[in-house]
C-alpha cells in the first residue's frame, strides 16, 4: 500500500509499504529516498511517536495514512566533562545516550580507553548501562572524569580500638568501594562505617582522589551505632523520600543524602520543619527532629536569593 510522510518543511514523501513493515523498515525507506539516517528520524502518527520494533499494523496505519517526520537534532545537547587536571571537554550528546556511549565519545576526543574512565555526577559514580536521562543530566551539566589508574596502592584504616587494616585500592575507588573492602576484611556492614580523613567525614559517592588520599595515607574508621533512625522528606510534588539518619547528622548531611537519592544539589534545597527553615550547620537534634518526623523540601530556584 502507499503511505505519505510529511516533513516539517511541508514536503510530502510517498512510500510503498506493507502493514507488516516495522517502523525501522519505514525509516530505511525514508533514508533511501531522502538520505536521512534512521537514528535522526522520529515518526509521529495520531500524536504518538512510533517505536522502531513495532509494525504499521500495530499502530493501525492504513493505506494513504500520513505520518509526520521530525528530525532528531544531531547531538541533542552539549555537556561538559571536567578532568582532574582541570581540563574541560565539550561533548555533543542526547539524553538517551548511555554512559558507555559517553565514554566512547571521550575516547574519540581524548584517547582514554573506557575501562580506565569513571564518570561522576552529583557525587554519584555513573553506571555504564544507564542513560544520561536516568541520572537527570541535562544540557550544560558538568560530569567529572576520574581515571582508574592501573596498578593501585596501599592505604591504612585505623579503628578506634587501635587496630590498623591495610587495603589495596586505586585512586579512582569510591568511598563505597573502600567500605566494601573493609566489610570483606572485618565483616562490618558499610552502613555502620564512617570514614574520616584530615578531619573530614568521607562521602560514599566521592573517590579517594577527590579527597587527595594517596598511597600509605591513613583513614580513621568510626562505627555508626545501629539505631540511627528514619525520617521522611516530602517534596512539593507530593513525593515522599525516606532517609536513614542519626540525631547527630547536620542539615548539610541530610541535604547530601537527598542529593544522593534525588540528584538535587544541596544549594537548591530548603528544608522546613515545624514551620522553620533549617540551617546547614545545625543538627537534627538541635531542632528536636525525631524518628519518623517529616521535613518539607522546597526548591530554591536558581538565581533567587
Curated annotation (Swiss-Prot):
<protein>
    <recommendedName>
        <fullName>Polyubiquitin</fullName>
    </recommendedName>
</protein>
<keyword id="KW-0963">Cytoplasm</keyword>
<keyword id="KW-0677">Repeat</keyword>
<feature type="domain" description="Ubiquitin-like 4">
    <location>
        <begin position="229"/>
        <end position="304"/>
    </location>
</feature>
<feature type="cross-link" description="Glycyl lysine isopeptide (Lys-Gly) (interchain with G-Cter in ubiquitin)">
    <location>
        <position position="6"/>
    </location>
</feature>
<feature type="cross-link" description="Glycyl lysine isopeptide (Lys-Gly) (interchain with G-Cter in ubiquitin)">
    <location>
        <position position="33"/>
    </location>
</feature>
<feature type="cross-link" description="Glycyl lysine isopeptide (Gly-Lys) (interchain with K-? in acceptor proteins)">
    <location>
        <position position="76"/>
    </location>
</feature>
<keyword id="KW-1017">Isopeptide bond</keyword>
<feature type="cross-link" description="Glycyl lysine isopeptide (Lys-Gly) (interchain with G-Cter in ubiquitin)">
    <location>
        <position position="11"/>
    </location>
</feature>
<keyword id="KW-0832">Ubl conjugation</keyword>
<comment type="similarity">
    <text>Belongs to the ubiquitin family.</text>
</comment>
<dbReference type="GO" id="GO:0005634">
    <property type="term" value="C:nucleus"/>
</dbReference>
<feature type="domain" description="Ubiquitin-like 1">
    <location>
        <begin position="1"/>
        <end position="76"/>
    </location>
</feature>
<dbReference type="InterPro" id="IPR000626">
    <property type="entry name" value="Ubiquitin-like_dom"/>
</dbReference>
<feature type="cross-link" description="Glycyl lysine isopeptide (Lys-Gly) (interchain with G-Cter in ubiquitin)">
    <location>
        <position position="27"/>
    </location>
</feature>
<dbReference type="Pfam" id="PF00240">
    <property type="entry name" value="ubiquitin"/>
</dbReference>
<dbReference type="InterPro" id="IPR019956">
    <property type="entry name" value="Ubiquitin_dom"/>
</dbReference>
<dbReference type="GO" id="GO:0005737">
    <property type="term" value="C:cytoplasm"/>
</dbReference>
<keyword id="KW-0539">Nucleus</keyword>
<feature type="domain" description="Ubiquitin-like 3">
    <location>
        <begin position="153"/>
        <end position="228"/>
    </location>
</feature>
<feature type="domain" description="Ubiquitin-like 2">
    <location>
        <begin position="77"/>
        <end position="152"/>
    </location>
</feature>
<feature type="cross-link" description="Glycyl lysine isopeptide (Lys-Gly) (interchain with G-Cter in ubiquitin)">
    <location>
        <position position="29"/>
    </location>
</feature>
<comment type="function">
    <text>Ubiquitin exists either covalently attached to another protein, or free (unanchored). When covalently bound, it is conjugated to target proteins via an isopeptide bond either as a monomer (monoubiquitin), a polymer linked via different Lys residues of the ubiquitin (polyubiquitin chains) or a linear polymer linked via the initiator Met of the ubiquitin (linear polyubiquitin chains).</text>
</comment>
<feature type="cross-link" description="Glycyl lysine isopeptide (Lys-Gly) (interchain with G-Cter in ubiquitin)">
    <location>
        <position position="48"/>
    </location>
</feature>
<dbReference type="InterPro" id="IPR019954">
    <property type="entry name" value="Ubiquitin_CS"/>
</dbReference>
<feature type="propeptide">
    <location>
        <position position="305"/>
    </location>
</feature>
<feature type="cross-link" description="Glycyl lysine isopeptide (Lys-Gly) (interchain with G-Cter in ubiquitin)">
    <location>
        <position position="63"/>
    </location>
</feature>
<dbReference type="InterPro" id="IPR050158">
    <property type="entry name" value="Ubiquitin_ubiquitin-like"/>
</dbReference>
<dbReference type="InterPro" id="IPR029071">
    <property type="entry name" value="Ubiquitin-like_domsf"/>
</dbReference>
Amino acid at each position: 500500500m502507499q503511505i505519505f510522510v510529511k516533513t516539517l518543511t511541508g514536503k510530502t514523501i510517498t512510500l510503498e509499504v506493507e502493514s507488516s513493515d516495522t517502523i525501522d523498515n519505514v525509516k530505511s525507506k525514508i533514508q533511501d529516498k531522502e538520505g536521512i539516517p534512521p537514528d535522526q528520524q522520529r515518526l509521529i502518527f495520531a500524536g504518538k511517536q512510533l517505536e522502531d520494533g513495532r509494525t504499521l499494523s500495530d499502530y493501525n496505519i492504513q493505506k494513504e495514512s500520513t505520518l509526520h517526520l521530525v528530525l532528531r537534532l544531531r547531538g541533542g545537547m552539549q555537556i561538559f566533562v571536567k578532568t582532574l587536571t582541570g581540563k574541560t571537554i565539550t561533548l555533543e550528546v542526547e539524553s538517551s545516550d548511555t554512559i558507555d556511549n559517553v565514554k566512547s565519545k571521550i575516547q574519540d576526543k581524548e584517547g582514554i580507553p573506557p575501562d580506565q574512565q569513571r564518570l561522576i555526577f552529583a557525587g554519584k559514580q555513573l553506571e555504564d548501562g544507564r542513560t544520561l536521562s536516568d541520572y537527570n543530566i541535562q544540557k550544560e551539566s558538568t560530569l567529572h572524569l576520574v581515571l582508574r589508574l592501573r596498578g593501585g596502592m596501599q592505604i591504612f584504616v585505623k579503628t578506634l580500638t587501635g587496630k590498623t587494616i591495610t587495603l589495596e585500592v586505586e585512586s579512582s575507588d569510591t568511598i563505597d568501594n573502600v567500605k566494601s573492602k573493609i566489610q570483606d576484611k572485618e565483616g562490618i556492614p558499610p552502613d555502620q562505617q564512617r570514614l574520616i580523613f584530615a578531619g573530614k567525614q568521607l562521602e560514599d559517592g566521592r573517590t579517594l582522589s577527590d579527597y587527595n588520599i594517596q598511597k600509605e595515607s591513613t583513614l580513621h574508621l568510626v562505627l555508626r551505632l545501629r539505631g540511627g533512625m528514619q525520617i521522611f522528606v516530602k517534596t512539593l510534588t507530593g513525593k515522599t523520600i525516606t532517609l536513614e539518619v542519626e540525631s547527630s547528622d547536620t542539615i548539610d548531611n541530610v541535604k547530601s543524602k537527598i542529593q544522593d537519592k534525588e540528584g538535587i544539589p544541596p544549594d537548591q534545597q530548603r528544608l522546613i520543619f515545624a514551620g522553620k527553615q533549617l540551617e546547614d550547620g545545625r543538627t537534627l537534634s538541635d531542632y528536636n527532629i525525631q524518628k519518623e518526623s517529616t521535613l518539607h523540601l522546597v526548591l530554591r530556584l536558581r538565581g533567587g536569593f
